[in-house]
Amino acid sequence: MFVQILIYVYLGICAGMILFNIATALLSRRREHRSFRDGIRLELTVSQELDRLAETGTVSERHLRFMERRLRRVNGMAAFDAALECLCVRRPELTRSYLTALNGVMIALAEDYCRRDEIEAAYFPYIIRKYRLLDGQENEALKTMLLDLLHESSIYCRENAMQALYTAGDPAVLVRALRIIDASSLYYHSKLLSDGLLNYTGDTWELADALWEAFDAFQPWMQVTLLNYFRFSSGAYCEKIHALLNDPAQDDEVRFACLRYLGRYPYPPAYADLLRYATPSKNARWEYAAIASSVLASYPGAETAAVLERNLYHPNWYIRFNASKSLEQLGFGYRD
């Protein structure tokens, strides 16, 4: 009897799970249908307003108030996103003008979204980045909101905020953002920042000037981040990088990044120093010799070959491996 009761209980649990899954699937389909329907309706509404914008050159106050109410809900913002995806393809110029007219609405929404939970708060800067709402706009309110999001614990909030700031084309606000991240105790992966800076939509030379001007004020890890960005963006900074490499006051990690930069962009005045760093020394960390051995692949010559051949016999595996790889890239075979 006890076994039968257990079987019936088990069957009841299984039936309950099946019913739960069916109900969840039906609700999910209903939400998807509602979201699709809302997107179509909102696309029609915005499209009609685009017609009015084309005729009169303005967006009605009534429509702006409607959009402010509509976009306060996350599902409304999602429907707006879906509508814009279509309209940006069909009517790109008018849609850009429409988004510019919506600037006041976005400012009003910014404070509201910043107070929400991290997922909803992260969605707002995603929309700003996706449709480049800051591009060419002197919108200090939105920029300030994005800077405030950099204090959030969620990496989604911080990364989406940075991605939005990259589209602003404003070097000064990016330096402010990097200073906030640099001073924060929250972890932010260096690669996210160095790769993100490559997405900057403004004048990259102005950005580089601003970053170099603020360079000394950053902590070593952020300096390495900036050097990695420079390494992947331009070879125009070899002279500055060479000076940093030979500055004993700089952190070792910063100097390692300088070595890697000079490996990507060969700089003849640095050749003698690279040979020196590639020669292992008891007074220097082994990483100098290992990285310099890899960098010398970009500097062919008899002295390069001699240093690398000596490093093949070094007890440190990384030095031996990098020396062998560089010799191989320079055309030396095993018989050589």
Language model regions located:
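Glycine- and small hydrophobic-enriched segments that form the cores of compact globular domains
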Residues: 128, 132, 139-217, 221
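Amphipathic alpha-helical repeat scaffolds
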Residues: 51, 110-114, 125, 146-147, ...
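N-terminal topogenic membrane-targeting module
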Residues: 24-115
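N-terminal signal-anchor transmembrane alpha helix of single-pass membrane proteins
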Residues: 1-38
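Short inter-helical turns and helix N-cap capping residues of alpha-solenoid HEAT/ARM repeat scaffolds
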Residues: 116-117, 153-155, 185-187, 218-219, ...
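Amphipathic alpha-helical scaffolding segments comprising HEAT/armadillo-like alpha-solenoid repeats
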Residues: 63-68, 100-114, 136-149, 171-181, ...
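Structural detector for internal amphipathic alpha-helices that build alpha-solenoid repeat scaffolds
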Residues: 82, 90-100, 122-134, 159-169, ...
